[in-house]
Amino acid sequence: QIDNVEPHERHLFDRWFNRWFLGAVDGFVYMSEQVHRELECYTNAPALFSPHPRFDSYGEPVDRTEACRRLGLDPQRRYALFFGLIREYKGLDWLLEAWAKLRAEGRIGSEWRLIVAGECYTDPEPYRRRIVQSGLEEEVTFHDRFIPDERVKDYFSAAEFLVLPYKSATQSGVTQIAYQFRLPVIVTRV
């Protein structure tokens, strides 16, 4: 099963390697139409669609107040969630900019907060600086670390919706987790 044909962070020999490697494979199982289109640029091998599986290994939703308590959050607040490995293409910079703008325009109520939970693929300091420069220190909870499986349910149970402002995407495992926890998802059109 092929997750991505093109890597999210591009390197010099990616296309050459893909042409060589994918040309040697007899067939593929892909998880999104975007991946299928990318695959067709490299090979005519047979391909079968199988959607990204749903994750059910994180348990069931827990009481929201209890989830907030476990995360050190005020249960009187309302939370939006950005979750997962933090990589440039996932658009956290866009989300922080939009949050600051909406707050300045009075379009986000004072009860709302943003939870950013996940390990940074690169240096987290640019995100931290943006939070401070935008005056969002009191509104953004930044858990820059690996989130163990047993804690995932707390984040998805504390939040009212998941935000995925991706700049590019093929499919997202984080979306499947949101489905498991029956959490609405706001996404960009990519």
Where are these regions (language model features)?
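Donor nucleotide-sugar binding/catalytic pocket of nucleotide-sugar-dependent glycosyltransferases
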Residues: 23-64
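Nucleotide-sugar donor-binding and catalytic loop/hinge architecture
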Residues: 62-79, 106-109
